[in-house]
């Protein structure tokens, strides 16, 4: 017989961003708890609002499954003394399992007998296990926690109720000074405390108190209401998924409505209006059929439609205050000179250990100049890059960005155009922030891409140089994102820039403000980011081999790893890699010996290998390069079959090691083949 179990935790309002992850965490931990306690179930349904986290376990077994376990003990010769009596070793073993020597049997394993005992545990009724579900609630982790009242414990928010029901049966449990039962709380204003009749009636009982417990249902309600408003008013409404997910975690009973604002504010840049509505007020944006912004917005009330006109007026009033700020800053910022703002950046701290923003920009400018040549920018693009690098942070001191920091770069582009800067310079100011997330949009222009690279590279090198290096999940300065941005930009534009060589050149730059340090740590940091770009199905040993190659062109690394993973399925892969691995292993003993003297060759196989290596010409065609190297396998094998590399004659030995090193110098540009496992 199966049952349904409901566990609901009632709290003060949680931050919207915490709700969904916490709900999923509760589901996962509850599932693990039940499995650990040998309780089978059909599925776990999730519920959440800003004021509750809940799960319903459907099809829960009414008792634990029985457990039969075999335990292996000491060997028979240790378990029995000379008289055939059980020794203390045997007695201690069974005592530890809660059994007696009478339960001992012997089993033969590889010709020797060992003590075995079988322990049987009869499954307990589910009612006896349920009180321990408070362990699940205690195990939940949150990004922030708090104390309340005089309690010593911490939790995401103060806990008010705990509802635990097995079908209709309520349980009296203790959790954080709260007694459980069947009581839950309705909507803060429209509902009241209510009794949950059973696990199955949970949604209906709360719905009667103006709480929609299912986040999926709340989301569907919001979308349906928005579409109805869209049809009613003949407009087009953007339903941003991220905004929708946030809004549905701000309300327990959603009611969407349309509000208005004065059309005069449409003269302010659209990005300002959209930011005011979406980021600050959590409003949905309204457009016409052609995509033009309209002086309306959609908001979602936490409640029903009663007195909705008052709610609309209140929201309109709040938004107007925001739009007034935006209009004011837009007007006043245009009175500022870019040169004056740039000059003031010397008084703005980039980081107390690193220096000012002006110093950061100076270093970025030098890096950008170096990258311009590497990326093949023409004279006009190089000039645009230099100008952009000289001013690109100026908008941080404008009133608009001070109020709406999400608009940094975006407003820089607009103000730059108004000040007469050309479009390429203005676009680069906006694009240098890209990508703003792990999979965010990348720059479209070469000038913007190079400026983004230079800015990110100085940021990474500067923080590493003063010891501010990410550890574990801690990355307060978003250096992983910056590094991933560098890697993704290089990959998108396909620039043949070797990151290792580039970093070497950057570490050679001299600045009055800072000296770069920690080069090897930075390189390892980049390797980790490149690895993230590789196909997850690529074997780890291939990834390692490729990342240890002497080539650090991002696109080449990614393509080489994919190519090797593909070739690993071919018949000749094992023999070719093993041949190359022997070369790599021995070449390590060359110790810098590079000069090859053909006069010291003592057999035809040496000459053949030297000639074959000479013919290997690496190009941009990675597949062709790999084919050339794999084709050397029979020549390499013949060489090893007829040649003693570590000859007694030092000159001959060094000559043979140098020959092998000449091959690894070429093959090592693709991978360190001796890192690939062929077993």
UniProtKB/Swiss-Prot annotation:
User: Which protein, by its recorded name, is this?
Assistant: Glycine--tRNA ligase beta subunit
One Pfam family, short name: tRNA_synt_2f
Q: Which organism is it from?
A: Streptococcus sanguinis (strain SK36)
What family does the entry list? Belongs to the class-II aminoacyl-tRNA synthetase family.
Major subcellular location class:
cytoplasm
Localization per record:
Cytoplasm
Biological process annotations from GO: arginyl-tRNA aminoacylation; glycyl-tRNA aminoacylation
One GO CC term, this protein: cytosol
The protein's annotated catalytic reaction(s) are: tRNA(Gly) + glycine + ATP = glycyl-tRNA(Gly) + AMP + diphosphate
Q: Which UniProt keywords apply?
A: Aminoacyl-tRNA synthetase, ATP-binding, Cytoplasm, Ligase, Nucleotide-binding, Protein biosynthesis
Q: How does it assemble?
A: Tetramer of two alpha and two beta subunits.
EC number(s) given by UniProt: 6.1.1.14
A GO molecular-function term, please? Answer: arginine-tRNA ligase activity
InterPro entries referenced in this protein's UniProt entry, alphabetically: DALR_anticod-bd, Gly-tRNA-synth_bsu, Gly-tRNA-synth_heterodimer
